[in-house]
Amino acid sequence: MPVNGIFDVFDMLSIYIIYKLIVSNNTWLIMRK
């Protein structure tokens, strides 16, 4: 059970980081125009 919880947290973190990277890349592309 604890291992599953740790993996859930890692999944949430990876999704959050990927989302942040995409958003920052999109804003950077918009600002460049």
UniProtKB/Swiss-Prot annotation:
Source taxon at top rank: Bacteria
Inducing stimuli: Expressed at fairly high levels during late logarithmic and stationary growth (at protein level). Expressed at low levels in stationary phase (at protein level).
UniProt GO cellular component terms: plasma membrane
Topology in the lipid bilayer: Single-pass membrane protein
Entry's transmembrane regions: 10-29
Signal peptide: none
Predominant subcellular localization, coarse grouping: membrane
Phenotype seen when the gene is deleted: No effect on iraD expression.
Keywords attached to this entry: Cell inner membrane, Cell membrane, Membrane, Transmembrane, Transmembrane helix
Intracellular or extracellular location(s): Cell inner membrane
Protein known as: Protein YtiC
Gene: ytiC
